Amino acid sequence: MKQISNSLRNSNKIPIWFMRQAGRYLPEYKKVRETTKNFLDFCFDVNKATEVTLQPIRRYGLDAAIIFSDILVLPSALGWEVDFKENIGPVLKQFKSQKDFQYLQRDSNNKLENVFKIIKKVKEKLPSNTSLIGFAGSPWTVMSYMLEGKGKRDFITSKKFVYENKILAKDLLNFITEKTADYLINQAKSGADILKIFDSWSGVLAEDDFTEFVIEPTKKIILKVKEVFINIPIITFPKGAGLLYEKFIKEVPIDILAVDQMVPLEKMKEWSNKVIVQGNLDPVVLLTNKEIIEEKTYKILQGMKGKNFIFNLGHGILPETPPENVEFLTKYIRLYEKKNSNSTF
């Protein structure tokens, strides 16, 4: 994992990267983004996606780049109708019955080929000491978007569907699970050093459903990927899992666990004895001022001192975040490292 793995072996070095580190808060991103109207077209544009992936690395000198893409690239590549509408977000054809399987293609690699080209091109341009992260949405989260037709907070339609259509729901889940594993394997073949599975909506499920729709498919994906790339680190992020994080840790063969900002620091410390923990500064903190950023960051750094830890946010950088605050945060962590290594902090 290059820089990240080297950092973890050196207890004084804290690996840093941010979810949505390439995005709407950066003026250089906006300049490139405005050249393409359709968001999915932008994600599949090799030159433009490569450029915006590299922008935060140039600006902040982070330890990892994450490919600029979207979790809904996969269902789109599988033939599912996906659109991104301004001020609304993703809008999808709703999956309602068995007949909707006819719209899903078994082979997505042709359309995803540009994603793999982006990974290869970024890898060529990335500093040699910087890790490259590829990613996909979790089967449950991708499936939820397909069942809802758009992003929601409660996912009532999705949960009602799986309760009433258990066999069909499981068929859809298994299909997405298989395709997600293949997608991640091909990202690794293209040069990704680390892989991440984003489960944005795992927190809406009760325990039994969490086991069936989050834990089991995640295990299948990891095991399938590891059959081909046994040593590739995989980051899992069951956002909002709450008390079920512990069940997830116990039952999923985790390398790195990303946690949201609701997870107590004491739990992060405890879990870091079993897995590498990534997190978990509240993204809203970056909307404030340097004093608050320093205060909140120091608490996390002190709490995770000497632990298996990667610094990140509890979710993605918000669009209204001042870039200078991200720069301050990054420099503050580097200063903490330096002072800590000299035992004067």
Curated annotation (Swiss-Prot):
SUPFAM superfamilies: UROD/MetE-like
Catalysed transformations (reactions): uroporphyrinogen III + 4 H(+) = coproporphyrinogen III + 4 CO2
Positions marked as site (Transition state stabilizer): D70
Binding site for substrate: R20, Q21, A22, G23, R24, F39, D70, Y145, S200, H315
Cytoplasm keyword on record: yes
EC numbers on record: 4.1.1.37
Keyword Iron: no
Entry-linked InterPro entries: UROD/MetE-like_sf, Uroporphyrinogen_deCO2ase_HemE, Uroporphyrinogen_deCOase
Enzyme class: lyase
Functional pathway: Porphyrin-containing compound metabolism; protoporphyrin-IX biosynthesis; coproporphyrinogen-III from 5-aminolevulinate: step 4/4
Main subcellular location of this protein, as a coarse class: cytoplasm
GO cellular component: cytosol
Pfam family, one: URO-D
Locations listed in the record: Cytoplasm
Gene Ontology MF, one: uroporphyrinogen decarboxylase activity
Annotated keywords: Cytoplasm, Decarboxylase, Lyase, Porphyrin biosynthesis
GO biological process, one term: protoporphyrinogen IX biosynthetic process
Subunit details: Homodimer.
Function field: Catalyzes the decarboxylation of four acetate groups of uroporphyrinogen-III to yield coproporphyrinogen-III.
Family stated for the protein in its record: Belongs to the uroporphyrinogen decarboxylase family.
NCBIfam families, A to Z: hemE
Protein name as it appears in the record: Uroporphyrinogen decarboxylase
Organism: Rickettsia typhi (strain ATCC VR-144 / Wilmington)
